Amino acid sequence: MIRTMVYHRKKIWVVFLICIMLLLGLVGRLWYLMNVRAEYYSKKAEDLHERERDIKAARGKILDIRGNILADNRTVCTVSVIHSQIKDPEKVIRVLSGALSVKEEEIRKKVEKISSIERIQTNVEKSIGDRIREYDLEGVKVDEDYRRYYPYGSLASKVLGFTGGDNQGIIGLEVKYDEILKGEPGKILTVTDARGVEIDGTGERRKEPVSGNTLRTSLDVNIQEYVQQAAGKVMEEKQAERVSILLMNPQNGEIYACVNVPEFDLNDPFTLNTEETAAEGEKKQDLLNRMWRNPCLNDTYEPGSTFKIITMAAGLEEGVVSTEDRFFCPGYKVVEDRRIHCAKRTGHGAQSFVEGAQNSCNPVFIEVGLRLGSDRYYKYFKQFGLLKKTGIDLQGEAGTIMHNPKNMGEVELATVSFGQSFQITPIQLATTVSGIINGGNRITPHFGISVESADGTKVRTLEYPVESGIVSGETSRTVRTILETVVSEGSGKNAGIQGFSIGGKTATSQTLPRGSGRYISSFLGFAPAEDPKVLALCIIYTPQGMYYGGIIAAPVVRSIFENVLPYLGIKRTVTETPSGENRADGVD
C-alpha cells in the first residue's frame, strides 16, 4: 500500500516538473517573440492591415538628335474597386457604367467579387477619371497612370516600336532600351481594419515612383519625314510591294533615317494597315507580326550588283585587279558548263575595269571573283564582317545566308561575285560598304546616342565597337573614285546632282524563283564621294513596269540628297556634273 502511494507520488512529481518545464518554455518563447522578434512580427502585423497599390513610373522619352520628342507619355487613369469598402454598390455600378461606357452586368461582376482590389478599367482618359473622382464613391479608387504616346504617328514606326498594356516595350527601341526607359514604380500603402476597410485618419504612405531615363537617338525627324515621303511616293508610282530606305553616317554608324513603307500607326499598333482588316485569331497575329517587321534588319535579300562593291574592294585589296586592267564582254561568261549572262545580252565589248563598274558588267566581276578564288573570296567575306551580324541596337537582326566554303565551286563563286545566290540584310550591306568607303573601319550601325535623366542631364554617352583595317586607305580611295564615276559617267547617272560629288552603285536582282518576273531594284549612294558623310540605300521590292535600279531607285536617292545634303551642311564642290538623263541600255 505504502509502496503504491510512493509510486503515485513520484508520477505526480514527474508530471508537475514536465508542466513547469513547458510553462517555462512558453514564457521563454513569449519573451523571445516580444523582445528579440518584436520588430519582425510588428512588421508582419502591419502587412496584414496594409493594402498596397502600385504607382506606375513615367516612362522615359525617346528623342531625335535635335531634341524633338518621338515617344512621350499621356496621363491616364486606372479605375479599381475595393469590395469591403463599398457602401452603395448600386450607385457605384451605375456611375462607373455610365462614365466608362461599360455594361452594368460587367461592372456588377467586378463590384460583387470578393477580393482585396478589383481593376475595372485601365487607360481611362484623365478627364473621365477626374469626373469619377467628383462622385467621391466609397470603395472606388482612381489612380493616375501613363499611356505611351507617339506625336508623329507612323513616323519610324518599325524603329521606335511600341509598348504593351503594362507599358513595357514590345518591339523596336522601346524593347531594346526598356531597362533605361521604364523607371521604378512607386507604392501607395493604406491601413485597414480586420475587414479590409481603410481606417479613417490614418492617411496613406507613399513611395514615389522614379521616372525612366530619356533616350536620345540619331534619328532626325526632318530627314525621316522627307525620306518616308519619298519612299511612299515611289511605292505608289511603281505599285511596289514595299520600299525600304536607309540613311546613315558611314563614318560612325549613326542612322539618320530608317524607312519601311508601308509603316503603321504607333498609337494604334494592333490595327492592320492592309486590306485584310477583318482577319482574326492566328491569321491576324501573323499579319501583325509581318506589319511590325523591320525589313532593313529582319529580312534578307539578294543584293544584286550593289554587292559588286565588295568584289571590287576584295580584288583591289588582294591585287588581282587594277583600274587599268582590260576586259572583254560578249554578253556572257562561261563558267564550268554554265553560261552566265550580262545584263546587256549583246555585250559591252572591250572595256577597262572602271568602265566595267560603270556598266555594271557581270562578266568583269565574275572574272575578278575567279581571280580571287573561293578561299580568298571567303577570306574577304569574313574580313569585311559579312559572316557576323552588324550589332545594330534593335532586336531580331537576321544573319547572312551564304554558301558553305566546302561547297563553293566556281559557279557559286561567279554568282556571288555579282550579288546573287546568297542573301544578306540591307543594314549589313550598308554597314559593309560604309567600312569600305570610310577608310577601312567597320562601324556598328546604331540609333542610340545618349541616355539623359528626366531633367535633361546627360547620364552617359552610348558607345559602339569599331573594327579598323578591313581594307587599306588606298583601296578605300580607289573604290570611292570608281563609284564616283559610276554616277558621273555610268549606270548611276540618275543619282547625279549639280555641284555635288556622289558615288554609288545600281542593282537589279530577280526574286526566287527565277523567271517569276519579280524584281528587286536598288541603289546605294554616298556623298561627298571624296569624304562620305551620308550613305543611302534605297530598295524597291517588286516594282511594276520598268524595274532597273538605275532608272527607278537612283532618282529616289537623288531627290533625298537634294534636300538632305544642304540640310546637313554639305556644300557643293563640283562645277560640272552629269545631266541626269535616264540610261536604260543595259543598266542595273
Where are the regions a protein language model picked out?
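Periplasmic/cell-envelope proteins involved in peptidoglycan metabolism and beta-lactam response
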Residues: 1-276, 300, 375-387, 396, ...
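Beta-lactam-recognizing serine transpeptidase/beta-lactamase-like catalytic domain environment
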Residues: 71, 193-204, 245, 250-306, ...
